[in-house]
């Protein structure tokens, strides 16, 4: 029997999603006759010899976002999925756009990377300078996002300068600012890629919120990708060095897909529900 070890953080903010994902993985492992052992990040002592680590497998499905821990596991010779560099680039929305900017064929939402130390409310003149820069780059509405955040959290729609100033004044973490894509109309496409193959695509739409996240009340239905769209998703996953991921696209004015963001530790439960298949089966089968 093949073994895979999974590492997760029990203090994960969205407890329900974490538990559902765990059950999905357990069911997938059972159907594939794989021994999947779960460990919390607290089970790993980085101050001990690697021979004393609790894993029966050299392959770690890393469900945490602790980049330092992932890098340490790699340093002792373990295969970590996703890799520390891939998690870092995907988890940081500013880095994601910087990495993909090296690939001009990947169309992205117009994005402005904000200053790293974001306490502009303490410096009114600098805050006004940044607002003027945003106004030169974009037309209202604009989207303000913390560079870290999942499930649609820390994402703000600013319809005018007053709302933008209010939003920026209350933030202390680095952000990105993006043009609001009105043609997408609270809808998006989530593409799941595993080991350079698209294993599922979902069209999502939210009637009650500008965010199209399933965790924010959006509903989903299967989406048929064209060959060009499939190639685009795989190109993004390869550029980000991600073994598996969820890529979110919006629709531009021509109804072509435009990159929004990528998720390294993608939650598979709701996508599996709408696609009527356990996506974790493809994930574990590709890892084993």
Curated annotation (Swiss-Prot):
Keywords: ATP-binding, Magnesium, Manganese, Metal-binding, Nucleotide-binding. Mn(2+) 2 binds at residues 261, 263. Gene3D superfamilies: 3.40.50.20, ATP-grasp fold, A domain (3.30.1490.20), ATP-grasp fold, B domain (3.30.470.20). One of its GO terms (cellular component) is cytoplasm. Residues 107-288 form the ATP-grasp domain. Mg(2+) 1 binds at residues 248, 261. This is Uncharacterized protein MG012 homolog. It comes from Mycoplasma pneumoniae (strain ATCC 29342 / M129 / Subtype 1) (Mycoplasmoides pneumoniae).
